[in-house]
Amino acid sequence: MPQLDPTLVKVLADGDVERANREKEQGPALSIFQVRDHGALLAIAGEARNALLYEIGNPVTASLMTRHRISAALYAPIRVVLYENDVGHGVFEYDQPSTTFGQFGDQRVTAVARGLDAALARSLLRATE
């Protein structure tokens, strides 16, 4: 999964709708916005382990939800934790987007979130290969 293209952020800030729509059609379904090393935080508490929190999403896709329910911005980007479990295996954990965004009771938002379910599942499967 690629890092979020910083030029896309500028495109959105500038209101370049044509370029944003092109990005929606041709760009990656999901990008990494930020990575936080929670394992380092655990090490401070004497519980060292591998644990990364990824914030991933697509700003254009997020806008398709927030235009109907601005409070959907509370949950975009999506957060995925990749951590080492007690027996040393890597585990992905996340809230399913359609469930999280479904709380708003707006079918337009939920429909976009179902697309995120599929994109997230594809991305995580690719990451395990």
Which residues fall in each region the model found?
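Short, low-complexity Ser/Thr-rich regulatory SLiMs
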Residues: 80-86
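Cytosolic covalent-transfer regions centered on His/Cys nucleophiles
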Residues: 1-75, 86-90, 97-129
